[in-house]
Regions:
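Disordered, acidic Ser/Thr/Pro-rich linker "stalks" and the adjacent N-terminal cap
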Residues: 2-86, 102-103, 182-187
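Extracellular carbohydrate recognition and processing domains
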Residues: 122-146
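Generic hydrophobic, helix-prone segments enriched in Leu/Val/Ile
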Residues: 25-30, 61, 109, 129-131, ...
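Aromatic, loop-rich ligand-recognition surfaces of beta-strand-rich domains
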Residues: 58-122, 144-187
């Protein structure tokens, strides 16, 4: 019998060719994430959030300053930035350029994807952790546990480095790596 014709997406590599590696993609937009349900006030420096995706490492978005403890003062599980990728993309890694008053002080950060097709702003529980770094400092790459198709990502800070009179994290730039669409094979 004759094998069925291949149903690979046009532009897929021929047998024996290596697929193109994942690479940086454009980020369509960003918004702050501080749900009231989680103890927040629905606002975490929203006016500065675009600086995390503006391509200028000298600018940044930062969390508010939290007192007493690095885990956001014990007030909430975390805060972060929601990234709009413009469409579903198969994400493999997220690179973060972070800074702290002391460059040796680490930040705990997670990469999450929404449970549904829309980015929830109601609670962090509506997002699934797909990668994390509990000792992030400087420029770090967080590889996702498995390549994940999603139109949105949440960069979620759960423990902040010390600053004067408290704790605060700064996010200078975010780069998202994804597999080129032409490399996806439809079975």
């Amino acid at each position: 019998s004759t094998p069925p014709p291949s149903s690979a997406v046009s532009g897929s590599p021929e047998p024996g060719e290596s697929p193109a590696p994942a690479g940086p993609i454009a980020i369509a937009g960003a918004s702050d994430f501080d749900p009231e349900t989680d103890g927040g006030n629905d606002e975490e420096n929203p006016d500065a959030v675009a600086k995390a995706i503006d391509g200028d490492p000298a600018t940044y978005w930062e969390t508010l300053r939290y007192k007493n403890r690095p885990n956001l003062g014990g007030l909430k599980p975390g805060v972060g930035v929601v990234l709009d990728l413009g469409e579903k993309r198969t994400v493999t890694a997220v690179e973060l350029m972070l800074s702290a008053d002391n460059p040796e002080d680490p930040t705990s950060v997670e990469i999450r994807v929404p449970e549904g097709s829309k980015p929830s702003t109601r609670t962090e529980a509506d997002w699934t952790v797909v990668g994390a770094n509990d000792a992030a400092k400087g420029t770090v790459t967080i590889e996702l546990d498995t390549p994940t198709e999603t139109p949105y990502l949440l960069v979620y800070f759960t423990k902040l480095p010390p600053t004067e009179n408290g704790y605060k994290a700064r996010l200078h730039e975010v780069t998202v790596d994804a597999i080129p669409d032409a490399e996806l094979v439809v079975e």
